[in-house]
Each structure stands twice: as C-alpha cells, then as structure tokens.
Amino acid sequence: SYSSKIKTLLHPEFLFPQSPSIQSEEELKQLQQQFYDSPNPMFESGISSAVLATQVMRNAFGIEPHAAFGYSMGEVSMLFSLGVWGSMDPMSEVLNASPLFHERIAGPMNSVREYWKLKDTDFQNESLWNWYTLRAEPELVAKALEKRERVYLVLINTPQEVVIAGEPSACKELIQELQCESHEIPVTDVVHCPPVQSEYEEIKKVHTNKVVDKPKVDFFSAADYTTTKLDSEILADNIARFYGRTVDFSKLVEEVYHSGARIFIDMGPRSSCARWISENLGDRTHLSLGICLLYTSDAADDRL
C-alpha cells in the first residue's frame, strides 16, 4: 500500500478547496500562493497525485509502461508510482522532521545564505530567490552565465527553453542581456544548482527508501542520463546528486527515445512535460500526451 494516510498526503485543502470562505478569484490566488510557500505539502501532494493517476492508467485502462523517467521531482514520483518503493508514510515522517525544506533549501534558504556568505541582515525585506522560464537556447544562457554570480541554469526543458534561478536582480540582468521572452514561475525552493550541494547527505537521507519491487521497466535517472539499478542506496544517491546540479530534460528525453520509446504519457500537472517532449522530438515519430490540463475538469475533458 502506498499510504495509510493518502488523504493527508494529497493535501486536499490546497488541491480541492471547498471552504465557504473561498468566494473570489483573489481568495483562490491567495490560497494558491500559500500552497507555493509550503514546499512539503507540494512535494507530498505532487507525488501522491502521480501515484493515483498511474494507478488509474494501469488498473482502469490497462496501460503498462516499458520505460519511466521524470522531470525533477518526477523521478521520485515514478519510483512510488510504479511500486519500486512501498509506502510513502516513512518518507513523509523523515521529510517533515528534516530541516531540508523548512530552512535549508526553502524558508530562509540557509544553504544559499551560507554559499553566498550573506550577513544575517541581508535580504530581510526582499526576495532572496526567484525562478524564471526563458525562451532561449541553453548554450547561449550557459555562456552568458560564465561571467555572472548568484544566478544558475537549473533546468533545460527543450533546445529553445530553459529555467534559471537565483537572486532576482541577477536573474533580471541576465534576461536583459539575452533580450529573450521570460516568465517568473512560482517555485519557492532551491534545487539543481551548486548551493544545494552542501545538503547532499540530508537529501540522500530523506530519499532513502526500501526497494520492495523491481518491475520489468527501464527506469532512467537524471543523475547519469541512463537506466539505473533499483537499489536503495543508488536511487537515493541519484536524487541527491541531481538536486545539486543542472537537470537536462532534453538529454533525458533523447536517451529514452533512443532506447525505443515512442509513446509518452505525462502523469504530471498541466501537461508541460508532454509539450516539452514533443518540442524535443520535433518531426520524429512519437506520440506525447498529458493527462492533466489546468482548470479543466477531468469529467468534462473530451479527450477521455
């Protein structure tokens, strides 16, 4: 069983607000921001939603995967969703007791403060860290970053789209230099960059789970961009390593495609990964589908 407290892990108070006090779009936005500012509930609900969606695909539609890979936290989701790891309850207990998302890579972001050698009085009244999606080629962004500090290339989505993160002013200066389309994204933790490397042991501890099954599925990891062994120590190390460096989703998609995959089903929110997969593969033979569209009722979705 995935969990004895699935309702708690889903955090329905954020995903499915039913309170009579939510009367306006503005109040809904405030609740959404509260969710963004709660990394542990976001982590747990994201994984739990993927687990449930995967069970529906397998049990209701009879769809079984030959390969699996994830985008950032999606690598954790795939291991629970396909039964490599068992119950999430022990991990939830470790996660919520850990300083990792409370103060190290979220909240006051002390790992960043230490890495940048900030004073206690620095960034008390302004944002320390922001994320931005850029419509720009990864190579151009990486080149521009060579002479900059406090801003990092954290994710490569496609050959034309990346994600940067860091001190807001440094990010905006980079965007101004590149003269590219950009969008701020509501992420409130620090991952996939050097300031996180000091947290390797704690990240590994949080993600150390007993392997309870080894399905006949090729599991790909962003740690080495190849298939991984289903070993508790190796899986935790994979995740702890890629938390501290850029994740190249484009490279991961290419590796999975070269392994023979042609049909891709995105189990995450907004079908973003489905879009990125298609952008990466272009005119090559493939089908990329997402199960979730923002603000679209599943019952009313005419694709089902």
Located regions from the model:
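Short acidic, glycine/proline-enriched helix-loop-strand junctions
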Residues: 274-291
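Conserved small/polar residues in nucleotide/adenosyl-binding loops
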Residues: 295-302
